[in-house]
A protein has these predicted regions:
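Class I SAM-dependent transferase core
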Residues: 1-38
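General small-molecule cofactor/ligand-binding pocket signal
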Residues: 15, 94-96, 197-200
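Hydrophobic/basic alpha-helical segments enriched in Actinobacteria
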Residues: 23, 122, 136, 205-206, ...
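Residue-level signal for inorganic ion chemistry
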Residues: 30, 128, 159, 217
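Conserved SAM/SAH cofactor-binding pocket of Class I
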Residues: 32-117, 121-127, 133-141
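Conserved Class I SAM-dependent methyltransferase catalytic core
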Residues: 153-210
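SAM/dcSAM-binding transferase cores
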Residues: 209-265
Length: 265
């Protein structure tokens, strides 16, 4: 199964399956929003970390944080192990092979929080759930790609439920979801005891509909009842199809050449 060797940040590279699931703009925007949400984070967990893209991007920008990635899919977990090790981060970034839905209570919850040195709760969480409910699309015959696209182990509601159980006082959770169904994120957040603070809508080209939204949330108990969710938009290409200044700034944030050699979208 051939792998490609790709730049992730100015200092980190990742191996990805050439014909498997690959990191894309939703991962980059989620990592960017997570870094902005709590730049001083010390205890960070990425749920459903896949091959380690968001996990490593955030760790790169927040070099003082202890981090943990959780991944259930075997092929992705193996790649995450290799990618963490190849970038010299195995001492700072731990990995857990398992289903994120099992981390909401008991010894499993205690173990993941202990792994980042935060028994009372992590201060930063991220996740990039699949967007397609079971039955709404035909899963890829490739298991890695199928789990990345179809909610075979749950959707945004499940990610939010686990985030609510792991987030510490004053912490922030960042998760992306289908822009066509914002009500799912809102309902999942409420059920998990979380309140949306910011929603970034990702638009592929000026004039097009948003493809996905990246939500930043805090614990409802920590926030005033009148808290209002701020909204913003990220446009990747202008009306002429050219990369926008926002897109170039996103690459520069991770110390990459703002003129990409090829698209990651």
């Amino acid at each position: 199964d051939p792998l490609t060797d790709d730049a992730l940040t100015g200092g980190y590279r990742v191996w990805q399956r050439k014909r498997g699931h690959r990191y894309s703009i939703d991962d980059v925007l989620t990592a960017h929003e997570a870094c902005l949400a709590l730049p001083g984070a010390s205890h960070y967990i990425d749920l459903g970390c896949g091959l380690g893209s968001v996990l490593l991007m955030v760790a790169y920008k927040l070099p003082a944080t202890r981090a943990l990635g959780v991944e259930a899919q075997e092929v992705s977990y193996a790649l995450a192990e290799r990618n963490v090790a190849r970038n010299g981060q195995a001492q700072r970034i731990a990995l857990r092979h398992g289903d994120l839905r099992g981390l909401r209570a008991g010894s499993a919850r205690d173990e993941v929080l202990a792994a980042v040195g935060a028994p009372g709760g992590a201060d930063l969480l991220s996740g990039t759930p699949p967007y397609m409910p079971v039955g709404t699309s035909t899963p890829s015959p490739d298991a890695q790609r199928a789990h990345a696209r179809v909610e075979l182990r749950g959707g945004i509601e499940d990610y939010l439920a686990t985030m609510g159980a792991l987030l510490g006082v004053g912490g922030r959770a960042v998760v992306c979801g289908d822009a066509r169904t914002p009500e799912r994120a809102a309902a999942g957040a409420a059920a998990a005891g979380l309140t949306p603070l910011r929603r970034l809508d990702a638009i592929p080209r000026e004039g097009a509909q948003a493809l996905f939204s990246v939500w930043t949330l805090g614990r409802t108990l920590d926030l005033p009842p009148e808290t209002v969710c701020a909204t913003d938009r990220f446009v990747a290409r202008d009306a002429d199809g050219q990369r926008t200044s926002a897109y170039r700034a996103l690459r520069s944030f991770f110390d990459l050449d703002p003129r990409p050699p090829h698209d990651i979208t």
